[in-house]
Amino acid sequence: FNVGNRKVWNVNGASNLLELRDRTKTHVLRRLKQDILDLPDKIITPVYLNLKSKEYMALMGEYYDWMEDDREKKSLTVQFSMLMKVRQIIAENKINETCELVENIIEQGKKVIVFTNFTDTLNRIADHFGKKAVKLDGKMSKVARQNSVDQFQENDKIKVFVGNLKAAGVGITLTAAEAVIMNDLSFVPSDHSQAEDR
């Protein structure tokens, strides 16, 4: 259809799907993960924590006061920034418990992946495990990222992979791990399912 002097294509929906399938069937190969990899079923176990640090309590008090104080007058950017600050404090307050969970898994002779959204949290968890851990974040080069993946997959001394949920949550294979821990969650549920499938 035309908009002004321009011709615009309507790309809503699809047509001629059978013809498309016939023409591409000799060139397209589709394999599903469940058809190729023999992986065990996922077991999801929520772990609830009671956060009581002074920093957390102070920030939550500030956040609730802020929420009650006519937040419609504040821009979405300010609202999002405040929410991110709260999320980051929560992530930092979970580090000790996350490290304890990881240590329990390592004691069983298993490898574990830890995902987080925040670089400071990622670094603190990786530093806690020292030479037993590798990390992957968005600042790393492709070569460094692949090195972290290879080390985790192939080196028996490396027991912990700590990754940024966005940077390490897709496009890599970490099948050496038997457990995945989400230190903190994304706003997007599909990020979690992608990361769990590493």
Task: Set out the residue ranges of the language-model regions.
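Inter-lobe coupling linker of SF2 helicases/translocases
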Residues: 1-110
